[in-house]
Amino acid sequence: MFKVRVIPCLDVKDGRVVKGVNFVGLRDAGDPVEAAIAYGAAGADELCFLDITATHENRGTILDVVKRTAEACFMPVTVGGGVRTVDDIRTLLNHGADKVSINSAAVSRREFVKEAAEKFGNQCIVVAIDAKRVARSGSDRWEIFTHGGRKETGIDAIEYAQEVVALGAGEILLTSMDRDGTKQGFDIPLTRAIADSITVPVIASGGVGNLDHLVAGIREGHATAVLAASIFHFGEFTVRQAKEHMARAGLPMRLDP
C-alpha cells in the first residue's frame, strides 16, 4: 500500500523564505536551504519550493537554492512558480529538482503539459491547480484561478484536472483558494471531487490548521499527500508529530526511527 506523504511548502522570494521558519536552532530562519535541511531531519517525505520572485530575471537565486538543497538533502524536492517553458523545467531538473510544478502556463497553453511530460516523463511533471467555488446560473462549481488566485478563468476545475492528466501530468497539487490561510481545514468536497475523477496522485493544499485536518485530507478528501506551510513553519507542530498523529489514525506513514 502506498505511504501517505507529508510535504512542507516554502515560499521563496529573491532567494529568501517569505515569513521565515520558526525552528529552534536555525541560524538563519530566512535561508531556504537551512529550512530544507531541518525539514529533512524532521522526517518530511518531500519538500516543495514555490518561487514567488516578482521578476523572471531573478531566477538565478532559486536555482542556487535548489542546487544547494539537493546537495544537502535526500528527500525529493518539487519546485514551482514562474515555470513557463520546457527550458525552465530542464534548468530546474539540472539543478537538482526532482519534480517541477507548472500552473498558469498550463492554463494558458495546455500543450505545454504534453510537451513537458513527453520530454521529461510524467513522473516529474506536477500541475498546480488553484480552485475557488463559484456560483454560476444557480449552481456552484469549482473554477480555476491564476496569478495567485487573482485572475478568474471560468474553467471548470474538475474538467481541467482530467484534461491535464490526459496530457501527461503525473500529479496534481490542488489548492483551495477559499480555504488557503484560513486554518479551517482543506476543502474536502473539492479535494474528493478532483481525486475521484482522475488516476494520478493528488496533493491537498490550503487551509491546514491542525493535525486532524491532515487526516481528513486523506481519509475524506481521498488525497494521497498533504501539503502545509504555517503549521510547520511557526513551530505549532513538527512534521514528526503530524506523521505520528496520522499513523495513530490508521493511515500508512513512513516513520523513521
From Swiss-Prot:
Catalytic activity entry: 5-[(5-phospho-1-deoxy-D-ribulos-1-ylimino)methylamino]-1-(5-phospho-beta-D-ribosyl)imidazole-4-carboxamide + L-glutamine = D-erythro-1-(imidazol-4-yl)glycerol 3-phosphate + 5-amino-1-(5-phospho-beta-D-ribosyl)imidazole-4-carboxamide + L-glutamate + H(+)
Subcellular location as annotated: Cytoplasm
GO MF entry, a single one: imidazoleglycerol-phosphate synthase activity
Cellular compartments per GO CC: cytoplasm
One family name in Pfam for this protein: His_biosynth
Source taxon at top rank: Bacteria
Pathway info: Amino-acid biosynthesis; L-histidine biosynthesis; L-histidine from 5-phospho-alpha-D-ribose 1-diphosphate: step 5/9
Keyword Signal appears in the UniProt entry: no
UniProt-annotated catalytic positions: D11, D130
Gene Ontology process terms (BP): L-histidine biosynthetic process
EC class (word): lyase
Keywords: Amino-acid biosynthesis, Cytoplasm, Histidine biosynthesis, Lyase
CDD domains associated with the record: HisF
Self-association and partners: Heterodimer of HisH and HisF.
Protein function: IGPS catalyzes the conversion of PRFAR and glutamine to IGP, AICAR and glutamate. The HisF subunit catalyzes the cyclization activity that produces IGP and AICAR from PRFAR using the ammonia provided by the HisH subunit.
Family, as annotated: Belongs to the HisA/HisF family.
Protein name according to UniProt: Imidazole glycerol phosphate synthase subunit HisF
Organism: Afipia carboxidovorans (strain ATCC 49405 / DSM 1227 / KCTC 32145 / OM5)
